[in-house]
C-alpha cells in the first residue's frame, strides 16, 4: 500500500512539474549572464572633448536576480578607463556594482534592464577616485541609455519549445531570487 501511495505521489508531482512548464517559462541567472556576455558591447566616450574626456569599456558583467533587492537585478563588472585631459592621459580600472529594473517588452520578446544606476564604484589606482566621482553622473546617464536601448535577454522562437511558447504567450515577468519567470497566464 505504501508503494502505491509513493508511486501516486511521484505521478502527481511529475504532472505538476509538467503543467508548470505549460504555465510559465523561467530564465536563470546563468542564462542572463551568458546573454550579457554575448551582447554587452558598452564602450563609450564621455566628458568634455578637449578638456577632459574618458573612454570607458565595460566587461565581465555578472547578474544577481532579485537577491539583494526584490524586483531588481544587481550587476557587477569591470570597466577600463582611459582618461585624457589637459594634464595628460591616465589609465584606470574600476569595479562597478549596478542596479536595474528588469522590464519585459512583449512585442520584441525581450527583457531590458531599465533605470540602470551605479550604486558602488572603486577605482585603481586610488588617486583616480575623485575623477571617477566627477564622471559618475555621465556614466550613469550613458549606462541608462545603453541598457534602455539594448535588451539583456531576447526570447527566441527557434531556441526551445518553452521559449517559443513564452514569446507568444507572455503576460509580463516576475523577478524571483535567482531567476526571471515569464508567466503565460494572469
Curated annotation (Swiss-Prot):
Cleavable signal peptide: 1-18
PROSITE patterns, A to Z: PROKAR_LIPOPROTEIN (PS51257)
Domain of life: Bacteria
Keyword presence, Cell membrane: yes
GO cellular component: plasma membrane
Bilayer disposition of the protein: Lipid-anchor
Lipidation (N-palmitoyl cysteine): 19
Location in the cell: Cell membrane
Lipidation (S-diacylglycerol cysteine): 19
Key words of the record: Cell membrane, Lipoprotein, Membrane, Palmitate, Signal
Protein name listed in UniProt: Uncharacterized lipoprotein YceB
Organism: Salmonella typhimurium (strain LT2 / SGSC1412 / ATCC 700720)
Lineage, highest ranks first: Bacteria, Pseudomonadati, Pseudomonadota, Gammaproteobacteria, Enterobacterales
Amino acid at each position: 500500500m505504501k508503494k502505491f501511495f509513493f508511486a501516486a505521489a511521484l505521478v502527481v508531482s511529475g504532472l505538476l512539474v509538467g503543467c508548470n512548464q505549460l504555465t510559465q517559462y523561467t530564465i536563470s541567472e546563468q542564462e542572463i549572464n551568458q546573454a550579457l556576455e554575448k551582447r554587452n558591447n558598452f564602450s563609450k566616450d564621455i566628458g568634455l572633448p578637449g578638456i577632459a574626456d574618458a573612454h570607458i569599456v565595460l566587461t565581465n558583467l555578472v547578474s544577481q536576480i532579485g537577491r539583494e533587492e526584490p524586483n531588481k537585478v544587481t550587476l557587477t563588472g569591470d570597466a577600463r578607463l582611459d582618461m585624457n585631459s589637459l594634464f595628460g592621459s591616465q589609465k584606470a580600472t574600476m569595479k562597478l556594482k549596478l542596479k536595474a529594473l528588469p522590464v519585459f517588452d512583449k512585442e520584441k520578446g525581450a527583457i531590458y534592464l531599465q533605470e540602470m544606476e551605479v550604486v558602488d564604484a572603486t577605482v585603481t589606482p586610488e588617486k583616480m577616485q575623485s575623477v571617477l566621482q566627477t564622471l559618475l553622473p555621465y556614466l550613469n546617464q550613458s549606462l541608462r541609455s545603453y541598457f534602455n536601448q539594448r535588451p539583456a535577454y531576447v526570447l527566441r522562437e527557434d531556441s526551445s519549445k518553452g521559449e517559443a511558447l513564452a514569446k507568444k504567450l507572455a503576460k509580463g515577468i516576475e523577478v524571483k531570487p535567482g531567476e526571471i519567470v515569464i508567466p503565460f497566464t494572469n
